[in-house]
Regions:
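Bacterial extracytoplasmic/cell-wall-associated proteins, especially those involved in peptidoglycan
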Residues: 25-154
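Single-pass alpha-helical membrane anchors
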Residues: 2-22
Length: 154
C-alpha cells in the first residue's frame, strides 16, 4: 500500500474516531461539569439540595441567552457559580474530586439532565445561601423555594 493511501486511510479513521470521541466527550463533559458544580455548591445539602442547584443550571440552559447555551457554558460563566471562582475554597475541591466523591452528584446530574428528576425550584434561575446577605438581584425577582440552606428565585 502506498504511503499516501495509508495516510489517507489513517486520517479518515482518526477523523471518525475524533468525531465520535468529541461527541462522547461533550455528553460526558456536560454531566461532569454539572456534577462538579452541584458538589461544590451543595454537597452539604443532601440529594434534594444538589438537585435544586442542578435544576437552576438546567433552567439557565433552557433560557439559552446570557447564561449560555450548554451546561458547561452556564456553570463556567464568570461569577455565576462561586465554586468555579479561582479565589473560592471549593474551586480546588471540585477540580480534584474523584469519581467516588462525585458519585451522588453524578447520579443526580444524570437524572436531572435526562428529565428523570423534576424541577423542584419553581423555575428558579438564581439562588443564594441563607448564610449571606441577600444579593441586590433578589429585589427584582420572585422567591420560588427554600431548599435546605438556599433561597431560590425566578
Amino acid at each position: 500500500m502506498s504511503t499516501i493511501k495509508t495516510l489517507a486511510i489513517s486520517g479518515a479513521v482518526y477523523g471518525v474516531y475524533r468525531g465520535v470521541k468529541k461527541a462522547l466527550d461533550s455528553t460526558v463533559d456536560q454531566a461532569d461539569y454539572m456534577a462538579r458544580t452541584i458538589y461544590g455548591e451543595a454537597r452539604g445539602e443532601g440529594a434534594r439540595g444538589m438537585q435544586a442547584v442542578a435544576n437552576v443550571i438546567m433552567n439557565r440552559v433552557k433560557k439559552n441567552g446570557w447564561y449560555g447555551a450548554s451546561i458547561k457554558d452556564v456553570v463556567l460563566k464568570p461569577w455565576q457559580f462561586s465554586c468555579w471562582n479561582d479565589n473560592d475554597k471549593n474551586s480546588s475541591i471540585i477540580k480534584q474530586a474523584n469519581a467516588a466523591q462525585l458519585k451522588q452528584a453524578r447520579e443526580i446530574a444524570d437524572k436531572v439532565i435526562s428529565g428523570e428528576l423534576p424541577d423542584i425550584t419553581g423555575g428558579a434561575t438564581h439562588y443564594y445561601a441563607s448564610s449571606i446577605k441577600a444579593p441586590v438581584w433578589t429585589k427584582t425577582m420572585n422567591k420560588t423555594a427554600t431548599i435546605g440552606n438556599h433561597y431560590f428565585y425566578a
